[in-house]
């Protein structure tokens, strides 16, 4: 009997303490539902609209935050299979995704590429002739972008290696193109698989994710002048994926699994919620912003911050779905 009691005591801290129900039914007053579908939100430069994806391998959409009207940006593209839409500082768009859907693995990796879409109504996406991995960092101040490459997009890389490329988008000619491409950081193996996230400090620095083995990840940053790299999360053995940065570059949103310390459940990219991390290098100033993972199967993900620091847009998601899949865009109002 004593052995059984000891076993139960040891087991109890790791038991899943999440509650049943839907987090959308118990939202705090500063969070509202914008849409009942969609994923991967992005604020317009004037913070008046939010672009988002209808679904993975789908169309890019745009919601007006004043009228709440929604229009499709890519419905003139037959069988559109885009994964991401992001605003440029000009109000135009960067699209990410394959030119057609083949299968989830190939279309998300080997065939994933960058596109330019003009803000003029009726415009069609234009290929930038650049394959890339996952998402991209798009400057809010200039036409600078950064993106990662893996072996699927760059055969010269060793198996497991990845690199981050920085480039400028040239819109001066008749066809948009990427110029001034240069490698800013490279990982030689799978101990750190790279993904670019956000420029900050007047485009002099870049946040990126270091995806690590066993479902772990770290929040990283690089000074683009000195090339000094900093691990900002400093939390080995846990999942910390940097997302939208706050204006001023002092804080960033992070998809993190830290709540698993008291809620239990498997750590990693499934059981995540949105946290706010101070980029001071200590890894200690971590504040939880959402509590969706308090519910069985629930999580909040893919947060972005408005440039006036008043709002965060994010999505409702499920722990069992692949990263990026969402079921609606929500708006979080920061209170003073």
Regions found by a protein language model. Give the residues of each.
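Sequence signature of WD/YWTD-type beta-propeller architectures
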Residues: 16-336
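N-terminal hydrophobic targeting signals that begin at the initiator methionine
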Residues: 1-2
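Hydrophobic h-region of N-terminal signal peptides that target proteins for export
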Residues: 5-16
């Amino acid at each position: 009997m004593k052995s059984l009691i000891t076993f139960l005591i040891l087991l109890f801290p790791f038991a899943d303490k999440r509650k049943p129900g839907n987090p959308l039914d118990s939202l705090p007053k500063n969070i509202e539902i914008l849409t009942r579908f969609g994923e991967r939100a992005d604020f317009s430069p004037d913070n008046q609209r939010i672009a988002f994806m209808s679904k993975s391998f789908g169309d890019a959409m745009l919601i007006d935050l004043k009228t709440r009207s929604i229009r499709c940006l890519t419905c003139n593209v037959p069988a559109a299979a885009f994964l991401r839409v992001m605003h440029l500082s000009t109000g135009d768009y960067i699209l990410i995704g394959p030119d057609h859907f083949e299968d989830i693995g190939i279309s998300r990796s080997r065939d994933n590429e960058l596109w330019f879409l003009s803000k003029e109504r009726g415009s069609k996406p234009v290929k930038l002739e650049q394959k890339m991995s996952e998402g991209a960092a798009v400057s809010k101040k200039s036409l600078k972008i950064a993106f990662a490459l893996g072996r699927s997009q760059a055969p010269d890389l060793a198996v497991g290696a990845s690199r981050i490329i920085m480039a400028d988008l040239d819109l001066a000619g008749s066809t948009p193109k990427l110029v001034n491409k240069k490698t800013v950081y490279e990982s030689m193996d799978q101990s750190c698989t790279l993904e670019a996230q956000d420029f900050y400090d007047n485009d002099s620095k870049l946040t990126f994710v270091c995806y690590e083995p066993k479902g772990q990840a770290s929040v990283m940053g690089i000074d683009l002048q000195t090339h000094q790299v900093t691990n900002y999360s400093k939390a080995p053995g846990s999942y910390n994926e940097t997302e939208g940065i706050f204006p001023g570059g002092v804080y960033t949103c992070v998809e993190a699994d830290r709540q698993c310390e008291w809620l239990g459940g498997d750590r990693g990219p499934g059981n995540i919620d949105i946290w706010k991390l101070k980029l001071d290098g200590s890894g200690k100033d971590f504040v939880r912003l959402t509590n969706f993972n308090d519910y069985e199967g629930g999580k909040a993900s893919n947060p972005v911050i408005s440039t006036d620091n008043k709002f965060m847009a994010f999505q409702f998601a499920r722990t069992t779905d692949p990263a990026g899949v969402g079921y609606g865009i929500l708006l979080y109002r920061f209170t003073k």
